[in-house]
Regions:
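Short alpha-helical oligomerization interface
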Residues: 89-101
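Conserved glycine-rich Rossmann-like NAD(P)H-binding loop of the short-chain dehydrogenase/reductase
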Residues: 24-39
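Residue(s) in the substrate-gating loop at a strand-loop-helix junction
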Residues: 131
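Single conserved hydrophobic/aromatic residue that forms the stacking wall/gate
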Residues: 147-159
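Conserved NAD(P)H cofactor-binding loop of Rossmann-fold oxidoreductase domains
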Residues: 81-86
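Rossmann-fold cofactor-recognition segment
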Residues: 45-60
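Conserved glycine-rich cofactor-binding loop
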Residues: 10-11
């Protein structure tokens, strides 16, 4: 059975992607901050879902990913779907720093961990979901434009 891990699977696009993969018969690892939402997903497909509470802003998030990989017996696809975006008309630094902690530091932390896992395994796929605001820019939320940090990783290959 193929295995996908989705970080940010408790709502939105991440949740819908998890449902699609479950429907296609994959083993799905779901992760996010809200334990009660993770449990609902697990109960919706007994035996097909593994859960792990992961907050990508925490330094121990890669260790939590390792725990989820172990529970699942491996990982074939990694999808990062966690992200936040808030209107910030006053350009309050705290709002931008919170966004950067999730969307930039969280990206670096989690994609790095997945990449090194796949490097050891010799294969695997990494996908990242972002916002259109990242490509167009949004004056009231400048940190959303930081998705471009992922561009250089698109062409990395594990041989």
């Amino acid at each position: 059975m193929k295995r996908i891990i989705i970080i940010g699977a408790t709502s939105g696009i991440g949740l819908e992607v998890a449902r699609c993969y479950l429907k296609d018969g994959w083993q799905v690892g779901v992760a996010g901050r809200r334990e009660e939402e993770l449990e609902k997903i697990r109960l919706s497909a007994p035996g097909q879902v593994c859960t792990q509470t992961i907050d990508v802003t925490r330094e121990d998030a890669p260790f939590s990913l390792e725990q989820l990989i172990t529970k699942m017996g491996g990982m074939d696809v990694f999808l990062l779907s966690s992200g936040i975006g808030k209107q910030n008309l006053s350009l309050c630094p705290d709002i931008e720093l919170q966004t950067a902690a999730t969307n930039v530091s969280g990206f670096i932390r989690m994609v790095n961990a997945a990449y090194h896992y796949f490097e050891q395994q010799g294969k695997g796929h990494i996908a990242v979901i972002s916002s259109i605001a990242g490509t167009k820019g949004l004056g009231s939320a400048p940190a959303l434009s930081l998705i471009h940090i992922s561009e250089p990783t698109r062409h990395l290959r594990i041989s």
